[in-house]
């Protein structure tokens, strides 16, 4: 980065910056609104800002964002998968999903990932770098700029572990919900983690209305260690205690994501174990038919197995849904599109 990342500044920092270059503090709100309400790409678009100030901003700062390089649109439901290029040439993925209740965007928080989950393509090449708040924001802003649709929900479930980029994710949340910016409702945002226990507890301390999702994927530690290396650091018991603390602090339910892998974690006994684990906890289970990955020998559970698993959880009074498969005709596991693009352009 050769210039200051102006899009990642909060309003107070922006006002202080403008004072430091001899401008009035009130200009901060104007600049902030141009960036976070108008989604501009360049300072010359700021029509109510003097040319002199625009030149100062151009000299000292940069509006970092994303550039669309490829996209796939589902003919079935309009789901759109994007590959975005960053300022340094790295590629990330984002998905726009259209529902009756509004438009939802799944964004990435890192370039690559170091968590090593066995069923995820995003982690095959490890972690390259964290995304800046500006780069997370612009995945959403780019959708609104190019499609004209209004995004009402955001899930941080794309490439990367959000709590491994904790400070930048917190700044993203501050900016995306700011009343002088997009002003997105906290309740319309979900952060998904594979289970970084200290961060879950820190997040609980914020007493935010942002939703928390846990990538669980196994009902016991032995199985989870096979699927997710993070389980060697934090046990399911530790995760559950952190989740209960989050629920106590926020009075909000936790979503547990459970990817069903054929003959691995989709049997009746696994559903019973999961039911016991979550009994009495304010939570919701999201069953995910796993996407096959060429490099991993995992297959998707049958529809009957998925339904049986759901039925057993419901019988045990666990709130559960099966994730709707969006854009089946352009389906690819998280990280697969980016991986194929890199292979074709290397």
Task: Provide a role label for each language-model segment.
Residues 1-92, 244-253, 258-346:
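Auxiliary Fe-S-binding modules of radical SAM enzymes
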Residues 74, 108-109, 122, 192, ...:
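Short linear Ser/Thr-Pro motifs
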Residues 80, 92, 103-107, 115, ...:
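Generic beta-strand structural signal
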Residues 88-97, 101-102:
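P-loop NTP-binding catalytic core
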Residues 98-135:
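Canonical Radical SAM [4Fe-4S] cluster-binding loop centered on the CxxxCxxC motif
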Residues 123-153:
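Conserved alpha-helical substructure of the radical SAM core
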Residues 144-153, 158-316, 320-323:
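Conserved AdoMet/S-adenosylmethionine-binding subsite of the radical SAM
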